A protein has these predicted regions:
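Bacterial N-terminal signal peptides that target proteins for export
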Residues: 1-8
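Structured alpha-helical
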Residues: 11
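C-terminal segment of classical bacterial N-terminal signal peptides
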Residues: 14-21
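Primarily secretory-pathway and cell-envelope proteins
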Residues: 22-64, 96, 108-169
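Mid-length scaffold segments of soluble, non-membrane domains
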Residues: 64-113
Length: 169
């Protein structure tokens, strides 16, 4: 009986100790989209929990990038009034206020804990909403646009209740 209790205790500890690792995986995601104009856009990112408490701590004017998602453009691309050169960019957001964010790109891949040069940040013509529901983990995609982005390819970033969209064509 003593051995059975010990075996059961070890099993319970092992199950409880292993549960967080099983309950919370992160996925490497890659999305490739060929836009009607011919450019290929590749999004590469790791899912991360939508921690809005950390987002609330971001200083106004700061560029932040949860897990440093990458956007690769095969050719030059129009994004609103901007022309963005072919290449690799880190996707992020700029905090404008408590409930106001702008989607942005930063040339190249940003190393972990590096401070991006604010002068190099490319602000995209984007919309922000907190009324699109909640994403428990960060979701990034390219979808057909609606509303003011009707008829355009739209880069979207959904993080908790924060939803940003920016036209890419």
């Amino acid at each position: 009986m003593k051995h059975l209790r010990l075996a059961l205790a070890i099993l319970v500890v092992a199950m409880l100790g292993g549960r967080p690792a099983l309950a919370h995986p992160h996925f490497q995601k890659t999305i490739v989209v060929k836009l009607p104009a011919g450019a290929e856009v590749t999004l590469t990112y790791n899912t991360t929990p939508a921690n809005e408490m950390r987002a609330a701590e971001v200083k106004v004017g700061s560029f932040v990038t949860p897990r440093r998602p990458l956007v690769k453009l095969s050719s030059e691309l129009k994004a609103g009034a901007l022309t963005i050169a072919a290449g690799e960019y880190t996707l992020g957001v700029i905090k404008n206020g408590d409930n106001d964010w702008t989607m942005a790109l930063y040339p190249g891949a940003i190393e972990r804990n590096a401070t991006p040069d604010p002068a190099k940040v490319i602000k995209l013509d984007s919309t922000y909403s907190s009324a699109q529901g909640k994403a428990e983990h960060m979701l990034i995609d390219i979808t057909p646009g609606a509303g003011r982005f009707e008829g355009k390819a739209v880069l979207t970033l959904h993080f908790g209740t924060m939803f940003l969209a920016a036209a890419l064509s």
